[in-house]
Amino acid sequence: MNAPRCLRRLLERQWRQGGWLSTLLRPLAALTGLVVARKRNAYLTGARAAWRAPVPVVVVGNIYVGGTGKTPVVIEVVRQLQARGWTPGVVSRGYGVDVGAAPRVGQGQLAAADYGDEPALIARATGAAIAVHPHRPRAVQALLRAHPGVDVVVSDDGLQHLALARDVEIVVQDERGVGNGRLLPAGPLREPAQRLADVDAIVTNAGRPRAAAAPAAGAPRQLAMWLEPTHAQRVTDGATRTLADLAALPPARLAAAAGIGNPARFFQTLEQAGIRPAHTLALPDHYAYAQSPFTALDADLILVTAKDAIKCAALDDPRLWAVQVGTRLSDPDFGDWLSATLRARQP
C-alpha cells in the first residue's frame, strides 16, 4: 500500500475517533474556524450581500467533508416537489468539469463529461433542468433564463455557498455524524458542529430502515434515509435482472465496484439485499473510467452504481450491470412539510 493511501486512512480514522495526528493539526483547524466564521458573519451582518432568486431555493449539503449521500437526497427532494405540483430546477458546481465563464444548462440524458457525475445522474433520474457553474447565483440566473417555468431551485452541495440566499437548508449526514467534532484538517468538518442547529432539516443516511425522530420545537426536522435496490440494468443494452436473480448467483461469479464518496456503503447495500459479491473494487470518487479497471476481475457480472454506469457505458463491457435504487425516508410527511415551508416563506 502506498504512503499517501496509508496517511489518508490514518487521517480518516482520526477524523472519527481523534488521536495524535488530529491533535497535532488543531492549530490549522483553528485557522479554518476563523475563515469560516468570518465569511459567515459577513453574510449574516450584511457586509456581503447574498443574491436572492425570484423563486424559492432549497439547499442540500453537508458539513462532513466527502460523501454522505447528498445526491440521493437531492433526487428525492426534486421528486417530492414534483409530486406536489412544483417545477424544480437544480444547480450544481459541476465537479471535475471545466464549465468556463458561462453556466452550462441542460436537461435529460446529460453527459457526465460535460456536466459532472452528480448533475448528469440527477438530470437522468428526475428529468429536471440542470445548470452547472461554481458561482451558484450565476447558475440560478442561467437556469431561470433557459427554463422560465422553474418555480423552485434545489442547490446541490450548496450549504457553504452563502452568496446564494436560501429558504430551506437540508443537511445530509451518515452514521459518522460529526466524527471527532473538529474542523478540517484536524477533523472532517467544513463548519462547526453547532451549524446543525441553524438548518431546517437533518437527513441521516442510515444505510438501513430506521424510525423518524420525534420533532422538537425549534429544532431541525430529523429523519433517516436509506437506499433500497430495486433491480439491475445492463449498461450496454438496458436488459434487466431482479435482485432475487442476482442473490441466487454464486458469489464467485459476482463482483462489485464503486467510484463514489463512500464505496463501502454501496457494498453494504448489496449485502443487505442478499447479494454478496466475491470481489469488490473501491475506486476514487469521480473516477473517470478513461481505461477499464475491470480487466483483471474474474467475474461474469460486475455490479456498479448508477452514477458510475453513466461513465462506464463507453467501456462497452457486457458484464457491467447498474444497480438501480430507490430512496426511502423515515418521515412520510417530509414532502408535505417541505412544500408547505416553501409556500410559507414565499413573499
Curated annotation (Swiss-Prot):
Which Pfam families does the record cross-reference, listed alphabetically?
Answer: LpxK (PF02606)
Q: Give the metabolic or biological pathway.
A: Glycolipid biosynthesis; lipid IV(A) biosynthesis; lipid IV(A) from (3R)-3-hydroxytetradecanoyl-[acyl-carrier-protein] and UDP-N-acetyl-alpha-D-glucosamine: step 6/6
Show the GO MF annotations.
ATP binding; tetraacyldisaccharide 4'-kinase activity
The enzyme's E.C. designation: 2.7.1.130
Q: Give GO BP annotations, semicolon-separated.
A: lipid A biosynthetic process; lipopolysaccharide core region biosynthetic process
Question: Can you supply one Gene Ontology CC term for this chain's record?
Answer: plasma membrane
From the UniProt record, list the reaction(s) this protein catalyses. Answer: a lipid A disaccharide + ATP = a lipid IVA + ADP + H(+)
- Binding of ATP occurs at Y64, V65, G66, G67, T68, G69, K70, T71
> Which keywords annotate this record?
ATP-binding, Kinase, Lipid A biosynthesis, Lipid biosynthesis, Lipid metabolism, Nucleotide-binding, Transferase
Enzyme class, UniProt record, top EC level: transferase
Signal peptide range equals none
Q: Which family does it belong to?
A: Belongs to the LpxK family.
The job of this chain, per UniProt, is described as: Transfers the gamma-phosphate of ATP to the 4'-position of a tetraacyldisaccharide 1-phosphate intermediate (termed DS-1-P) to form tetraacyldisaccharide 1,4'-bis-phosphate (lipid IVA).
* NCBIfam families listed in its UniProt record: lpxK (TIGR00682)
Protein name as annotated: Tetraacyldisaccharide 4'-kinase
Source organism (scientific name): Bordetella parapertussis (strain 12822 / ATCC BAA-587 / NCTC 13253)
